[in-house]
Structures are given as C-alpha cells and as structure tokens.
C-alpha cells in the first residue's frame, strides 16, 4: 500500500514483485557507480590542467571503454530476461479471470464458474465509508485465493487501458481485440490497490482496481454466495 510522500517501491506481495525489487536495487547500484565515476572524472578535468592535447591514438583505452560497457550491459540484461520469462510463464493455474476495460470501469468474469461476473466501478467520494480510500475504492472487489497461481486474461471493449497493481508487480495493457495474459500470486492476504495506467479519456483517473486476497476456503465460500 502506498503512503504519502513515498519515494520507494511499494512492499512486495508476490514473488514477481520481490524479483523486480531486487533487480531495481541491482541496476540502481550499477547506475550509481557509473554516475559517481563520471562525476569524478568531470571534477578532475575542471580542477586540474593535466591534459593530453597531442594524443591521437590510444587503442588500450578504446578497448577498455568498449569491453567494459558491454560487460555492464550483460550484467543488466541477464537478470532482466530471467524476470521477463518468469512473468510470461504460468503452469497449471488454479483459476482464470477475464478482465475487460471500459470507459471508465472494469468488468470481471471468472471463467471457471458459471455466471460469476460483475462490473467494478469507483465509489464516489460522497459515498465513502470511514476508513475507505478516496479514488481507490470500488463497489465490487476482485476476490482471489492467496498463495495460488491465477491467470488474468486482460483486454478492452473500447480504447487502450492498462491493468496495474504495483504491490503485486502487475501492469498489463488492455488492447481491443487482443487478449494479454498476466500471472497473479499473492504471498499474504489483504487488499491491494491499483489503477488504470494508460490514459484512456476524461475519466481515466477514476478506474481503480481492488484485489482482495483471501484463504482458499474463504474464496470458495464467497464464490458459492455469488453464483
């Protein structure tokens, strides 16, 4: 859950988000070291007069500044590719949920259950109950079982949308005429908030997403009551 004046990432709630957080820290350290080196060299150039204006050829230096960046890029690319394939693959999902973006709300269909589908609209500010979050609450939450792999099929009925829940490491475009896939796995129960992350019109800011992750037994009771 985000909090005011937050500068870092939200707490990781899924294995994918944990990997993304680690990759962020790994890449940020490389960027920090390179930036420090560049600033150090610039400061030396500005504060000293030790220059080589007559140097026309330096093959050793050119070799170093060609090979070293290539090695650094490999160190960044390999972990990135690993996470990319982890996000793409899903084996034996226990549940499939189809998500459709509309102007300006989301609709959900639990394809493993007959007639279990609903629309999810933002709760207006004047209808909020004490403790609820402005611009983030919805009238129908997406209830899912925790600690189990769930497949989300995401598309759109009209314009481009993007289904995003930061604490779960999820952000998938909703494209008309195309089904995109995302994997949802939560390590713990709770409410996880997201929003449409693709500008889709005048009410783009009023398309919140709320996932309620619960134990499997509670999910079965909820699904039975909804059918």
Curated annotation (Swiss-Prot):
Cited CDD domains: CcO_II_C
UniProt keyword annotation of Transport present: yes
Listed EC numbers: 7.1.1.9
Chain segments annotated as transmembrane: 15-45, 60-87
A GO CC term attached to the entry: respiratory chain complex IV
Residue positions binding Cu cation A2: 196, 198, 200, 204
Localisation per UniProt entry: Mitochondrion inner membrane
Binding site for Mg(2+): 198
Cofactor-binding details, from the entry: Binds a dinuclear copper A center per subunit.
Record function comment: Component of the cytochrome c oxidase, the last enzyme in the mitochondrial electron transport chain which drives oxidative phosphorylation. The respiratory chain contains 3 multisubunit complexes succinate dehydrogenase (complex II, CII), ubiquinol-cytochrome c oxidoreductase (cytochrome b-c1 complex, complex III, CIII) and cytochrome c oxidase (complex IV, CIV), that cooperate to transfer electrons derived from NADH and succinate to molecular oxygen, creating an electrochemical gradient over the inner membrane that drives transmembrane transport and the ATP synthase.
Protein's UniProt name: Cytochrome c oxidase subunit 2
Name of the coding gene: MT-CO2
């Amino acid at each position: 859950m985000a909090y005011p004046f937050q500068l870092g990432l939200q707490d990781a709630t899924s294995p994918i988000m944990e990997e993304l957080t680690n990759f962020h820290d790994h890449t940020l350290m490389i960027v920090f070291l390179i930036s420090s080196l560049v600033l150090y060299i610039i400061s030396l150039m500005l504060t000293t007069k030790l220059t080589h204006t007559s140097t026309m050829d330096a093959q050793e230096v050119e070799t170093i500044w060609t090979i070293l960046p290539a090695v650094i890029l490999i160190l960044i690319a390999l972990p990135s590719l690993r996470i990319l394939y982890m996000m793409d693959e899903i084996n034996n999902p226990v549940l499939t949920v189809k998500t459709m973006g509309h102007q300006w709300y989301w609709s959900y269909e639990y394809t493993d259950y007959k007639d279990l589908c609903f629309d999810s609209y933002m709760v207006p500010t004047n209808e909020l109950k004490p403790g609820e979050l402005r611009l983030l609450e919805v009238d129908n939450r997406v209830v899912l079982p925790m600690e189990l792999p769930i497949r989300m099929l995401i598309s759109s009925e009209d314009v481009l949308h993007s289904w995003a829940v930061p604490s779960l490491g999820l952000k998938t475009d909703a494209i008309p005429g195309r089904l995109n896939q995302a994997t949802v796995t939560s390590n713990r129960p709770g409410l996880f908030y997201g929003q449409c992350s693709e500008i889709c019109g005048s009410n783009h800011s009023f398309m919140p997403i709320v996932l309620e992750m619960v134990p499997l037994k509670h999910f079965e009771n909820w699904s039975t009551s909804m059918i």
